[in-house]
Amino acid sequence: MTDDRDAGGFPVSAGVLFGLGLGGFFDGIILHQVLQWHHMLTSAGYPPDSVRNFQINVMWDGLFHMSTYAFTAAGLYVLWRYSRRNHVRWSRKLLPGAMLVGFGAFNLIEGIIDHQILGIHHVNETVPREQWIYWDLGFLAWGAAMVVGGWYLLKRGQQETRLRTA
């Protein structure tokens, strides 16, 4: 992660935390609730085929959402604290870049740990089981692309901010 002191007056860690939170919100709201492709423990012995299993999954989905709120609140706190001590230099590239790094990191961490190592759920469990890996790999590729794109934006934003202040 980029050090906040080297970001040309912008707290990169705040943007990364916002991105981690938004990545979790996207996963939880879109994939768990709207599309209902999976829930937190659907591949860990709690398929949504009974009211009791559904209740367990909804509770774990809620705990998951609490963690995404925590990331978002931490990002807000870091931004607030930084802005009380320093002048924040806003950039069209720094905040989106940092958020993309965080969102992509969420996908990579969640995709590797929950989908591959623990196997507690997979991205799209509505397709035949032999196709789950393709959705999981696509999720990881999407996350990697966001990290790379976000890193590029961060570097460009830092260069532009330094030039403006020089």
Language-model regions, residue ranges each:
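Perimembrane loop-to-helix junctions flanking transmembrane segments
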Residues: H38-F54
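Cytoplasmic juxtamembrane regions at transmembrane-helix boundaries
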Residues: L76-G102, Q158-A166
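Cytosolic juxtamembrane amphipathic/interface segments immediately preceding
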Residues: M1-D6, N53
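Interfacial segments of alpha-helical transmembrane regions
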Residues: D6-G21, H87-A105
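Interfacial helix-loop-helix junctions of multi-pass membrane proteins
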Residues: L31-L41, G111-W132
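Terminal transmembrane helical module of multi-pass membrane proteins
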Residues: G143-A166
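Hydrophobic cores of alpha-helical transmembrane segments in multi-pass integral membrane proteins
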Residues: G15-F26, S67-L76, G102-F106, G143-V148
